[in-house]
């Protein structure tokens, strides 16, 4: 039996939800027993473990509030990779953005048989701009040692109610317990997508939330998930996307690929860029139109390749727009590609943009339409 099959059959066999009779962890409640623990109960070679995590996503009438709490045990501070953490935040081209609030984080250690905690300071917070639409707030926890416990909580406020971040129940370290709740008005419709090799079990309920809204009766739907001991996820060589096998769930506002296409076509940062006149290239286009189609296309491609510089930023939407790009000569991947398509069409070479996912994000799921999939 090959390594791939052995790894995942093994994960399937031990992915039994072992129910805990103890109380759920609460922020600030760290015990000497937890700090003195030197090895994980089920995975003795684990470098760290998630003692508990909880996520609550609440759609508050078109805006999303997400509460996150995690408690992490560090067994090997040099190899765990869990002595810091990051939060991904999305920003639309219109300037709407997700924001993080009320972050509190501590590292706990034992000194003279007493619990001592170190608070995360502002100078230990960093921002990494991944693309025009995505940034990551990174937090480097202080005073992390073998045996430490890291604990943090924060809130995300998002104007994108249709875009609920994926919730992972499985990581590269064991997760002892995980709770996840999603609450939304009944008139909101979401697609649900589950990942992993073991089906998730959820509980659903509804309750009245006071006066009726303009969309009808004000009923809130709640979906609840709970897992106990999910084993660490082991990567396998040559696997295209390990996240397809990570136990997780994702909710996204219902739409269709046709609606996604219409949204892109009408966007001032995408489709409308293809209609820009590009006056500085008028003479160039008139000249290349005299060439055969193949030479015409090669000439335009070479012109764009020589004239413009990629700023190393990804994104399906333009950053500068093709007009500004033609003046400043630098832009993101959408700026340059949409200008190329615009020029090809002006030269009577019918060209259409194609939008997909990056290879690292795995294959595009056609059954789960949405802008966040692209």
Please report, for each region that a protein language model flagged, where it lies by residue:
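Bacterial Sec-dependent N-terminal signal peptides
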Residues: 1-26
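Alpha-helical structural motif
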Residues: 8, 66, 99-101, 176, ...
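Residues at structural and domain junctions
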Residues: 8, 56, 136, 166, ...
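Polar helix-capping/helix-linker motif
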Residues: 15, 75-78, 307
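Active-site neighborhood of thiol-dependent amide/isopeptide-bond enzymes
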Residues: 133, 289-374
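Acidic low-complexity segments
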Residues: 235-319
């Amino acid at each position: 039996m090959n390594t791939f099959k052995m790894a995942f059959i093994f994960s399937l066999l031990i992915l039994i939800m072992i129910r805990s009779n103890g109380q759920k962890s609460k922020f600030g409640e760290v015990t000497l027993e937890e700090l003195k623990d030197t090895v994980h109960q089920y995975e003795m070679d684990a470098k760290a473990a998630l003692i508990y995590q909880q996520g609550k996503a609440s759609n508050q009438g078109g805006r999303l509030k997400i509460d996150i709490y995690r408690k992490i045990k560090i067994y090997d501070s040099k190899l765990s990779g869990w002595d810091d953490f990051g939060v991904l935040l999305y920003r639309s081209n219109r300037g709407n953005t997700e924001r993080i609030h009320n972050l509190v984080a501590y590292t706990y250690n034992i000194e003279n048989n007493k619990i001592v905690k170190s608070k995360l300071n502002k100078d230990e917070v960093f921002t990494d701009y991944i693309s025009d639409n995505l940034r990551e707030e990174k937090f480097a926890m202080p005073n992390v040692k073998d045996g430490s416990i890291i604990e943090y909580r924060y809130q995300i406020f998002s104007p994108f109610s249709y875009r609920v971040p994926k919730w992972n129940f499985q990581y590269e370290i064991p997760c002892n317990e995980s709770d996840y709740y999603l609450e939304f008005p009944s008139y909101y419709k979401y697609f649900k997508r589950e990942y992993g090799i073991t089906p998730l079990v959820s509980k659903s309920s509804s309750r009245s939330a006071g006066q009726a809204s303009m969309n009808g009766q004000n009923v809130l739907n709640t979906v609840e998930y709970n897992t106990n001991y999910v084993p660490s996820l082991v990567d396998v060589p040559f696997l295209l996307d390990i996240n397809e096998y990570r136990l997780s769930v994702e909710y996204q506002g219902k739409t269709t690929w046709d609606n996604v296409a219409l949204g892109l076509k009408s966007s001032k940062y995408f489709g409308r860029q293809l209609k820009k006149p590009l006056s500085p290239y008028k003479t160039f286009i008139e000249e290349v139109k005299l060439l055969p189609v193949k030479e015409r296309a090669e000439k335009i491609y070479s012109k764009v390749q020589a004239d413009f510089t990629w700023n190393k930023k990804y994104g399906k939407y333009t950053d500068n727009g093709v007009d500004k790009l033609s003046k400043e000569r630098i832009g993101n991947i959408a700026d340059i590609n949409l200008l190329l398509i615009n020029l090809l069409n002006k030269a009577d070479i019918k060209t259409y943009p194609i939008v997909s996912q990056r290879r690292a994000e795995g294959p595009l799921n056609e059954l789960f339409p949405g802008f966040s999939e692209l």
